[in-house]
Amino acid sequence: MSEIWEDAIKSNAWPFVEAKKILDSLNGQIPEKGYVLFETGYGPSGLPHIGTFGENARMVMVQKAFEQLSDIPTKLICFSDDMDGLRKVPSNIPNPEMVAQYMDMPLTSIPDTFGECESYGHYMNAKLRSFLDKFGFEYEFYSSTNCYKAGMFDEMLIMVLEKYDEIMELMLPTFREERKATYSPFMPICPKTGKVLQVPIEKWDAKAGTVTYKDKAGNYIEVPVTGGHCKLQWKPDFGMRWAALKVDYEMYGKDHLANARLYSEICRILGGKPPVQLCYELFLDENGEKISKSKGNSISIDDWLKYAPVESMALFMYQNPTRAKRLFFDVIPKNVDEYITFNQKYHLEEDRAKRVANPVYHIHHGNVPKIETFGITYSLLLNLTSVCNPSDKSVLWGFISKYEPQATPNTNPYLDHLAEFAIRYYNDFIKAHKSYLSPSEKHKVILQDILDMLSDIADQTEAEAIQKAIYDIGMKAGYANLRDYFKDLYQILLGQNEGPRLGTFIKLYGVQEMKKLVEGQL
């Protein structure tokens, strides 16, 4: 057992809560297969997006939490539904008109529009695996195409035939009348075209292991359900997979919630035990719409990592998985700064129970690196970048070194990366939107007061003292709401509606530099 077992078993951190559910479902016993199986799924119709990363990151958090509670071995598989027929051509791929010729073909039977792999599905799988590998996930990759064709599901597919009536009785009430007339859990792969067919099944034979359907010419075609000659509809497929692989834990997006009962019931019909399940909320774009691989309306992994460290992305995934969150570029700075705060709290905290409840414990699976930024946040660096418009990070380091002589790019690589990220983010998202407020006569009086205050203070004056002095100037100016006062200052001095704590910012930027900035507006 882990040395933190006692704290972990009492913890309300959601990965430990989920891990306890799994342990309870097993009654503390090792499963017959010898390990606890965690499964994530991937639909490779379009390029993997950040939500795909999120599901795997969260799954590993639960897996590692379970390993703190139990000595039972674990395994994580990532299952790709790459045998699904193409239903819609993604808008963000090259040569979409070529792909459109292969509608209803299994994704692994469509030529690779990127020209790199043996099929479109193989390319998408490779993209998924490359970034899972990049972030150090330990997993086994399962391809639906390979599982069906290799016979891994054959026993279960025969059982679906044997339980055909029971499964139909479960499924049919969920459809409209016209769909009821044509539905079958089996989708034959057309021997002539290779397409995944959604056709009525005229006859099924459990002993022979076959289904029969009518082709367009009216001919009866009999095909085996085994060996990759048929694919299950996605709802029965989900439940069948749970039973076949003996999955112990699965998480899925809210779009699956309405069908989760069906997955579980089909798993039971096929003699399996449904896994413990977590339904997470979907990410929304800045307009409140669901992000989609095929639409390409989300932040990609590469997008996020262009502007921020991977830990900030992992924190975004950790926070409130059952609550809908908007995922767009504006959330990046906030998550970087929250990560810095959680990291510092973790290393200052002596109470082990509080440490294992800290998000960074789960992000780093218990091995939390210590970072030092000397109180400099990502937001502060963005504001520094905004006033000095640096060509490269060495300009920012000039200010950082004056603020904290101990800090260097070599001894503080995290801070060095933040400086680089801040310049990129500023150039791409802030620079073009800067809009300065022309100071009124009232504002000029305030600016003169700030200038006088800066002229009177000593270089060693603490940030809090500077902040209080600026606060007092706002009070003296008669603002009913000091938020309006600071907003005016940010608009006049930075060209932005929001900004930093000015005391800390002035310490970083330098009193003399700040005086020049204020003088420039007078």
UniProtKB/Swiss-Prot annotation:
Q: What is an example of a Pfam family matching this protein?
A: tRNA-synt_1f
- What Enzyme Commission number(s) apply to this enzyme? 6.1.1.6
For the motif 'HIGH' region, what are the positions? 44-52
Q: Which residues cross the membrane?
A: none
- Keyword annotations of the record: Aminoacyl-tRNA synthetase, ATP-binding, Cytoplasm, Ligase, Nucleotide-binding, Protein biosynthesis
Which reactions fall under this protein's catalytic activity? tRNA(Lys) + L-lysine + ATP = L-lysyl-tRNA(Lys) + AMP + diphosphate
Chief location bin? cytoplasm
Query: What domain of life does the native source organism fall in?
Result: Bacteria
- Return the similarity comment: Belongs to the class-I aminoacyl-tRNA synthetase family.
Q: Identify this protein by name.
A: Lysine--tRNA ligase
Q: Which gene encodes it?
A: lysS
